[in-house]
Amino acid sequence: MIKRQKDRKFELVSKFKPAGDQQQAINKLTAGFEKGYKEQILEGATGTGKTFTMANIIAKLNKPTLVITHNKTLVGQLYGEFKGFFPNNAVEYFVSYYDYYQPEAYVPQSDTYIEKDSAINDEIDQLRHATTSALMERNDVIVVASVSCIYGLGDPKEYARSVLMIHEGQEYERNTLLRDLVNLQYDRNDIDFQRGRFRVRGDVVEIFPAGNSNHAYRVEFFGDEIDRIVEIDSLTGEVIGERESISLFPATHFMTNDEQLRRALKAISKEMKVQVKKFEGEGKLLEAERIKQRTTYDMEMMGEVGYTNGIENYSRHMEGRKVGEPPYTLLDFFPDDFLILIDESHATMPEIRAMYNGDRNRKKTLIDYGFRLPSALDNRPLKLAEFEKHVNQILYVSATPGDYELERTDHKVEQIIRPTGLLDPKIEVRPIEGQIDDLVGEINKRIDRNERVFVTTLTKKMAEDLTDYLKDLGIKVRYLHSDIKTLERMQILRDLRLGKFDVLIGINLLREGIDVPEVSLVAILDADKEGFLRAYRPLVQTMGRAARNANGEVIMYADTITDSMKAAIEATQRRRKLQEEFNKEHGIVPKTIIKPVHDVISITKPSEDSKKEKTDSFADLNFDELTAKQKKTMIKNLQEQMKEAAKKLDFEEAANLRDAIMELQSSSRRPKTRKGKALNGKR
């Protein structure tokens, strides 16, 4: 079995030193964990450099670390930042490897069975394998993950037992190596050399590990002895360097042996008979026949080829778990003494809590109607209580920690001072009567100063009406809403920053990627209408959009001051006062953040001859006017751009490209119903 190296240290590389009150936060939180505190909170205002603080804590504690956040875009951003902070350590990326996923489901009302359909992203699968192999080999590992890390991943002990370690001079027959590779789920293919495959050329075996992106190994034999091991470029075959020894990890996380498979098939057969008998006793003959046919077919497939579509539904039997026992997840691959950082904890923890119930409700219907055995319920994400049992030490990080975190621990550290000296925005409450005329006056002031404005409304109709009204007044305005596609959204934000329009109206401007330094005014209409979008945390998050500009201001239009408004205003004013005192003491003058405006991702690929080729923006396209060939070409170009972005570690751009590809693929499958450009949500 492979042994983990334990003597590696985290090495933080940065031209910056902790500034503002980052150092006190780093010291307090590090000391707390060293004292044995299990749970702590970092309440850091927007723009105070919470990620840099997290990096310093990781370096000081020197423990394997799992960073979890609630969506893939944020995972990509954090991965890129940590990769930059720790270039000499293992920083890994772990998200769901599905580009497209339609879960198996049944709708009783219409008697509709929806079969599971999915498309796996090969690059993300490689990154997942790189994650688990790094966790097995070394202790200086940071894994940045989405909540998919609480889903089943296979038994880490069986995975570790399966690792094949070979070294130069070892007595090892070539054919024995080939059999061992097949047992590790590697495929032999002498022509198409890809991850998880090997090829044979006389006494030379070339192996492309599942966790590598472009490097493979060449193992050269002399008789029954390994004569030489070299690392090669998988595409060109160029030798990169010689290796004394290598560890070959399985090509799948779900490793099983023949004995386990025999036991599993026996247990599945037994459960099937019990379920058939139950249905027959209830007079449900259709369900009884259905579960018998489906399960028998699956067992025959597993017996013949070791696999069947939906094999994960039998994971409890394959792994020998008891009824209700939690599945193995990424968390089980970590050593006992590890650190968890929950980024944006106010959003991430509710998502971790919600995963189990959503999964269970869908599967319960499949079981009740004879599509799956009851054991399918144990192929699931962790329950919140099970997640908590995995926690050794955990840090919740948020500008607005949730009730869950605040109830779990009293150990809270604030980070209020921004290294840039920027203050929390000024806040003013004005009456609703005449709010639009007042807003127009404030917008014109910002336009005169070449600044931008965010306006947040409560309803889609109000946002649309306000957009039309401002346009009639000659104000350059756009409306951001949920119907707008990924790349069009990026184009809108870029155009706002470039000054192509001055006002952006939306219902929920809390989504990631909305930080625009040019925005000096955030106007919140109907601020006193209590609800999700006007609760304390969303209000604080919305106010934070004006915290990137030295002239940042928030105007809340309301006739009464609700408890949520009062709490949000008081919290912001308290922080602003502390920031002003700090700036005065240290002679700091706040300056607006200077952030370069990146080009929106192009749809057409520039030619080698001319880099000036015109490109279309995603916003200007009507998918229904494109031919199937045009869509295919566009998808291919976007896929190339996605791979290039991933190579440059720009995972935010890669994730946006992936979303755009999925939108194009989806438009290719659905019937044509749209007319005209999908701009501003109009049909």
UniProtKB/Swiss-Prot annotation:
<protein>
    <recommendedName>
        <fullName>UvrABC system protein B</fullName>
    </recommendedName>
</protein>
<dbReference type="Pfam" id="PF04851">
    <property type="entry name" value="ResIII"/>
</dbReference>
<keyword id="KW-0234">DNA repair</keyword>
<dbReference type="GO" id="GO:0009381">
    <property type="term" value="F:excinuclease ABC activity"/>
</dbReference>
<keyword id="KW-0227">DNA damage</keyword>
<dbReference type="GO" id="GO:0006289">
    <property type="term" value="P:nucleotide-excision repair"/>
</dbReference>
<dbReference type="InterPro" id="IPR036876">
    <property type="entry name" value="UVR_dom_sf"/>
</dbReference>
<dbReference type="InterPro" id="IPR004807">
    <property type="entry name" value="UvrB"/>
</dbReference>
<keyword id="KW-0742">SOS response</keyword>
<feature type="domain" description="UVR">
    <location>
        <begin position="632"/>
        <end position="667"/>
    </location>
</feature>
<feature type="short sequence motif" description="Beta-hairpin">
    <location>
        <begin position="97"/>
        <end position="120"/>
    </location>
</feature>
<dbReference type="InterPro" id="IPR006935">
    <property type="entry name" value="Helicase/UvrB_N"/>
</dbReference>
<keyword id="KW-0228">DNA excision</keyword>
<feature type="compositionally biased region" description="Basic residues">
    <location>
        <begin position="669"/>
        <end position="683"/>
    </location>
</feature>
<dbReference type="InterPro" id="IPR014001">
    <property type="entry name" value="Helicase_ATP-bd"/>
</dbReference>
<dbReference type="GO" id="GO:0009380">
    <property type="term" value="C:excinuclease repair complex"/>
</dbReference>
<dbReference type="GO" id="GO:0003677">
    <property type="term" value="F:DNA binding"/>
</dbReference>
<comment type="similarity">
    <text>Belongs to the UvrB family.</text>
</comment>
<dbReference type="InterPro" id="IPR001943">
    <property type="entry name" value="UVR_dom"/>
</dbReference>
<dbReference type="InterPro" id="IPR001650">
    <property type="entry name" value="Helicase_C-like"/>
</dbReference>
<keyword id="KW-0963">Cytoplasm</keyword>
<dbReference type="GO" id="GO:0009432">
    <property type="term" value="P:SOS response"/>
</dbReference>
<feature type="binding site">
    <location>
        <begin position="44"/>
        <end position="51"/>
    </location>
    <ligand>
        <name>ATP</name>
    </ligand>
</feature>
<keyword id="KW-0547">Nucleotide-binding</keyword>
<dbReference type="Pfam" id="PF12344">
    <property type="entry name" value="UvrB"/>
</dbReference>
<feature type="region of interest" description="Disordered">
    <location>
        <begin position="662"/>
        <end position="683"/>
    </location>
</feature>
<keyword id="KW-0267">Excision nuclease</keyword>
<dbReference type="Pfam" id="PF17757">
    <property type="entry name" value="UvrB_inter"/>
</dbReference>
<dbReference type="Pfam" id="PF00271">
    <property type="entry name" value="Helicase_C"/>
</dbReference>
<dbReference type="Pfam" id="PF02151">
    <property type="entry name" value="UVR"/>
</dbReference>
<dbReference type="InterPro" id="IPR027417">
    <property type="entry name" value="P-loop_NTPase"/>
</dbReference>
<feature type="domain" description="Helicase ATP-binding">
    <location>
        <begin position="31"/>
        <end position="414"/>
    </location>
</feature>
<dbReference type="InterPro" id="IPR041471">
    <property type="entry name" value="UvrB_inter"/>
</dbReference>
<dbReference type="GO" id="GO:0016887">
    <property type="term" value="F:ATP hydrolysis activity"/>
</dbReference>
<dbReference type="InterPro" id="IPR024759">
    <property type="entry name" value="UvrB_YAD/RRR_dom"/>
</dbReference>
<dbReference type="GO" id="GO:0005524">
    <property type="term" value="F:ATP binding"/>
</dbReference>
<dbReference type="GO" id="GO:0005737">
    <property type="term" value="C:cytoplasm"/>
</dbReference>
<keyword id="KW-0067">ATP-binding</keyword>
<comment type="function">
    <text>The UvrABC repair system catalyzes the recognition and processing of DNA lesions. A damage recognition complex composed of 2 UvrA and 2 UvrB subunits scans DNA for abnormalities. Upon binding of the UvrA(2)B(2) complex to a putative damaged site, the DNA wraps around one UvrB monomer. DNA wrap is dependent on ATP binding by UvrB and probably causes local melting of the DNA helix, facilitating insertion of UvrB beta-hairpin between the DNA strands. Then UvrB probes one DNA strand for the presence of a lesion.</text>
</comment>
<comment type="subunit">
    <text>Forms a heterotetramer with UvrA during the search for lesions. Interacts with UvrC in an incision complex.</text>
</comment>
<feature type="domain" description="Helicase C-terminal">
    <location>
        <begin position="435"/>
        <end position="601"/>
    </location>
</feature>
